[in-house]
A protein has these predicted regions:
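Short, positively charged
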Residues: 118, 122-153, 157-159
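A short glycine-rich beta-alpha junction/loop motif
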Residues: 92, 106-113, 144-168
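A short beta-sheet element
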Residues: 53-54, 64-131
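DNA target-recognition patches
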Residues: 21-73
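Extended hydrophobic-aromatic, low-complexity segments
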Residues: 99, 123-125, 137-139, 166-170, ...
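Short beta-alpha junctions and helix-cap segments that line functional grooves
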Residues: 37-40, 100-102, 172
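Residues that recognize and position ribonucleotide moieties
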Residues: 16, 50, 62, 106, ...
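Non-catalytic DNA-recognition/assembly elements of restriction-modification systems
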Residues: 1-34, 46, 156, 160-203
Length: 203
């Protein structure tokens, strides 16, 4: 979608009633996170607030994170608590341009842009749209000079947006819910495998 020419976008608008919006215009708000100081133990020790790193964003559903921060860590840094159904995009590193979908409330580091939408249907539409556009996003980011993205670049990505009733009729949240269930099942199987291997090694 990002790589449509002006004439192609105009054709869509005129012919199908679709229209063009930037990510910033489509979303209620976009935010980047931060990393609470690693030297302040009370920001991390015993933390229960999920904190997502860019390496954990790889076209996936986020149900748990490798690290958590404390309330003090949230209050003592510029990271923000993002609501469930926020869409994520990694801005730096090997996963730059890849997308995630929050199935939990979570904070993120500074290498992630969080995109908050009006509805679950719009969030799901944005998630799948950005996945579809990844190759074009990679080509156009910073003129192709480097792999890193900026929040400003993400805010200005063009989306082809159908009328609200069309987005609702696609029932994309049902696909997201099935992905969440599948992810939970994978976690259960991983835990069973870990338990079985631990029992075998103790014999």
């Amino acid at each position: 979608m990002i790589n449509l020419t002006d004439s192609e976008m105009e054709s869509l608008v005129l012919k199908d009633g679709f229209f063009i919006k930037t990510v910033a215009d489509f979303c209620l708000e976009t935010k980047s996170g931060s990393t609470p100081s690693r030297t302040t133990n009370e920001f991390w020790d015993g933390g229960t607030i999920s904190w997502v790193k860019s390496g954990e964003v790889h076209n996936n559903i986020t149900l748990r994170t490798e690290e958590c921060i404390t309330q003090e860590g949230l209050n003592g840094s510029s990271t923000k608590l993002l609501p469930t159904d926020t869409v994520l995009m990694a801005m730096y590193g090997v996963t730059a341009g890849e997308v995630g979908y929050l199935a939990i409330e979570a904070t993120t580091n500074q290498a992630i842009c969080g995109m908050i939408c009006n509805t679950k249907a719009e969030a799901a539409y944005l998630y799948f749209s950005l996945i579809q556009s990844q190759a074009a996003i990679s080509r156009l980011s910073n003129g192709g000079a480097q792999d890193n993205l900026s929040k400003n670049f993400i805010d200005n990505i063009n989306l082809v947006v159908p009328p609200t009733e069309v987005i609702e009729s696609l029932n994309l949240p049902a696909i997201i819910e099935q992905m969440i269930l599948n992810t939970k099942e994978i976690f259960v199987l991983e835990e069973l495998q870990y338990t079985a291997l631990a029992q075998l090694s103790s014999r």
